[in-house]
UniProtKB/Swiss-Prot annotation:
It holds the Pfam family ABC_tran. This is Phosphate import ATP-binding protein PstB. The complex is composed of two ATP-binding proteins (PstB), two transmembrane proteins (PstC and PstA) and a solute-binding protein (PstS). Gene3D superfamilies: P-loop containing nucleotide triphosphate hydrolases. The gene is pstB. One of its GO terms (molecular function) is ATP binding.
Length: 288
């Protein structure tokens, strides 16, 4: 079972498809005028399913700031999760997808032939809607990606695992039970374990796709508190269906509607002084 998980993990971290990223297109490797206060700059991005027959994103242009929490809001099917997956090329796990445009991460074009998918997925970690602990011990869950990178030294592993679990506000709850199976943890603990597993690789960015949607209010509160602490070290980009959550935790908010960015800016401005009618209608519950 462990070997099978390792093979799947390696495939997940490094896999690409020939059609999805359209790497035959000539792209600029670097963006010379990249703003150092940003972590991502996205330019003229369009994304398609079904070999171009179904367009999911339209002409997306967006700058995402470093060490901020940026929330993506909008109705179901508006493109926010699709866009999130593009930021670490997870879209390439889906067949028959294609896109045009550019995504720059720390000046580099992530779809350039020179950019390593493995390096990107280490630097831009992902936490999914449903907690995904591996069926192994708590310790081995956090150690898994480290060992996959070739780290075998027990002292380094122990130190990194403790640091990661502390950063995920989980250490005090599990420090005496590190050999227990991870799937026996509560839902909220499992999600924090997945966050610990992601930050063990020392990423710059954490992508979170509705990380609290399956959790109770108490577990949700703990995750939100954790996000506020983590933004001191990481850039966090979160998809949420909860406008209240976006207001509580995010510095910047991006409103998607029918595959387009309608409005983005400081969260207070989006919710208190929206410029666009569609934004006002969504926030006030008139569209959804």
């Amino acid at each position: 079972m462990i070997k099978d998980i390792k093979n799947k993990f390696s495939k997940l971290m490094s896999s690409v498809t020939k059609t999805s990223s359209d790497l035959k297109t000539k792209r600029n490797d670097f963006k010379e005028d990249f703003d150092d206060s940003n972590i991502f700059e996205i330019r003229d991005l369009n994304f398609y399913y079904e070999n171009g027959k179904k367009q999911a994103l339209y002409d997306v242009n967006l700058d995402i700031k470093k060490n901020k929490v940026t929330s993506f809001i909008g109705p179901s099917g508006c493109g926010k999760s699709t866009f999130l997956r593009l930021l670490n090329r997870m879209n390439e796990l889906l067949p028959n997808t294609t896109f045009d445009g550019d995504i720059y991460f720390e000046k580099q074009n992530i779809y350039s032939k020179k950019f390593s998918v493995l390096d990107l997925r280490i630097k831009v970690g992902m936490v999914f809607q449903k907690a995904t602990p591996f069926p192994m011990s708590i310790y081995d869950n956090v150690a898994f990606a480290l060992k996959n990178q070739g780290i075998k030294n027990k002292k380094i592993l122990d130190e990194t695992i403790e640091k990661s679990l502390r950063s995920a506000a989980l250490w005090d709850e599990v420090k005496d039970n590190l050999n227990d199976i991870a799937t026996d943890l509560s839902g909220g603990q499992q999600q924090r374990l997945c966050i610990a597993r992601a930050i063990a690789c020392k990423p710059s960015v954490l992508l979170m796709d509705e990380p609290t949607s399956a959790l109770d209010p108490i577990a949700t509160s703990k995750i939100e508190e954790l996000i506020m602490e983590l933004k001191e070290k990481y850039t966090i980009i979160i998809v949420t269906h909860s406008m209240a959550q976006a207001q509580r935790i995010s510095d910047e908010t991006v409103f998607f509607f029918q595959g387009k960015i309608i409005e983005n800016g400081p969260t207070k401005n989006i919710f208190l002084k929206p410029k666009e009618k569609k934004t006002r209608d969504y926030i006030n519950g008139r569209i959804g």
